[in-house]
Amino acid sequence: MKRNLNENSTRSTAGCLPVPLFNQKKRNRQPLTSNPCTNDPGISNASDNYDFPPLPSDWAWEAVNPELPPLTKTVNTGQIPHSVSNSLRSQDSLSKPIQSNAGSSKSDWSYRDGNKNTSLKTWDKNDFKPQCKRRNLMTNNGINSGPINLGAQQQKQLRVSESTNLPNQRESEALRQTKSSEIPGSTMRSLDKNSTLQAFKPNFQQNQFKKKMLDGFQEVNTLKKEASSYQLKLREKDNSLRIISAVIESMKYWREHVQKTVLLFEILAVLDSAVRPGPYCSKTFLMRDGKHTLPCVFYEIDRELPRLIRGRVHRCVGNYDQKKNIFKCVSVRPASASEQKTFQAFVKIVDAEMRYYTSVMNEV
């Protein structure tokens, strides 16, 4: 709590800056300023009523005891006696660094008070650090907490000390900026995380888009490959040997209309005669398809003719000789049931293809 003194107190050294005597041996104290006020029984010595600037030893003491209540400075409006002013003049060299520290503490703490909008007379240990305890006291009065009613020489010294405190103030401002940047560390980290997440999201979306594009290109490439392979297959089919499924009547018809092209026919017919041997290792037999009959010949050059059963359906593949009216077979075997079922469909497909082929060949 702030201790207020009566204006008519016997204390005449208000406004002076005493020198603290810390870390020294115990001895009979001689007050440097004046005797304490007799009206205030709670005051034991002069050093209890004054707030000293932060010194290294004082900082260590506050770090050990952070929860001590702040000390307040009492100001007496009385005049300074001549004996005390002489002692103050002898201690000008000590007062200058003290005032420099006070100036730096003022520039540091006033900024924080302006930001937090707190009262200058209260202090909370949860809001501030222990090192700032005495700085708050010094900034409550600022330069006015210094000696009042000093002479012109003291005021000049204060001005000189303030001019020398400018670099210290700049350093303190730099430290304050670094501290203020360090205080909201969690928020800054969260913002950094959010920024990284936000920066990561478009990158992730771009990667997905690229993957989709690559997948699309791969699909297109596969389609192109499939199309090219299909075209190759078609070309192979175009260049490959085609067997024309036909009955006896249609075979004779296509052979008559397409004379310049070599055609290989496939017919399904019933064996209507016995197999007879012929010249040049040949065997002859007769095939019947409804009302139409067709003589066939098979030359046993590289293989023998398998055993054929009269009255059964056989599959014969070969070339038709229109001049001799004979079908030269290269393959003869019994037809399966599936071939017999699908043969009529094959004949219709072949008729359509042969009509298109003959129309194109006639235009050429």
UniProtKB/Swiss-Prot annotation:
Span list, region Disordered: 1-51, 70-189
Organism: Bos taurus (Bovine)
The protein's name: Spermatogenesis-associated protein 22
Biased composition (Polar residues): 1-13, 30-48, 73-108, 137-169, 177-189
Subunit-level organization: Component of a multiprotein complex with MEIOB and RPA2. Interacts with MEIOB. Interacts with the complex BRME1:HSF2BP:BRCA2.
Function: Meiosis-specific protein required for homologous recombination in meiosis I.
GO BP, one annotated term: reproductive system development
Compartments, as annotated in UniProt: Chromosome
Any GO CC annotation of this UniProt entry: chromosome
InterPro entries: Spata22
Alphabetically ordered keywords of this record: Chromosome, Meiosis
Main localization category: nucleus
